[in-house]
Amino acid sequence: MLKVAILDDYQNVSHEFVDLKKLSGKYEFKIFSEPFKDEADAIEQLADFEALLIMRERTPITKNLIDNLNDLKYIITSGSRNKAIDLAAAKKRRVIICGTEIDFAGTTELTWGLILGLARNFKEEIDNMYQGYWQSTIGFELKGKILGLIGLGRVGSQVAKIGKAFGMEVMAWSE
């Protein structure tokens, strides 16, 4: 049975989206919902695992960590890349690394939620509403404003399209 450590699941996403019981015949899972104290703690707690399933870039998967996990065979990351993984060290140890496809719609939506929240003072308005006040501030329209973006990759280009739909002038810098 392959021993799999699920790291950095601070929001218990693995329970919500995956039925781990269906996989229990072939895999033994342990979910780490809290960060490790330090690298020595990570080495101690992960020593017996053959696979690390890592979420985002929270725990650095360093050369030292990889070199000290003798049973490690696989590193699986959410997303197509993870800058927290020392790829050269993994390659040297012949640890297989794989990722998942990612849909950037959620990131784009969150970006626009935050922009709209700032433009329309959502936090202040919600706080005031709970205190019995209604429409205490005036936000501003996005139409005609300049949206500055650094990077026009997959997320930036989607954010730019929505900015144009709001009638904004989009200015961007990208390599």
Predicted regions and their residues:
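Phosphate-coordination loops involved in phosphoryl transfer and adenosine-cofactor binding
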Residues: 1, 72, 143-146
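N-terminal glycine-/charge-rich "phosphate-binding" loop or analogous flexible N-terminal tail
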Residues: 1-51, 55-56
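Cofactor-binding loop segments of dinucleotide-utilizing enzymes, especially the Rossmann-like FAD-
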Residues: 7-9, 34, 80, 152, ...
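Short glycine-/acidic-enriched loop or helix-start segments at secondary-structure transitions
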Residues: 15-17, 41, 62-65, 84-87, ...
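Anion (oxyanion) recognition and catalysis
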Residues: 23, 91, 164
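Hydrophobic beta-strand scaffold residues
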Residues: 29, 96-97, 170
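Phosphate/diphosphate ligand-binding glycine-rich loop within oxidoreductases
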Residues: 49-126, 130, 139-140
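Rossmann-like dinucleotide/phosphate-binding beta-alpha-beta segment
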Residues: 137-175
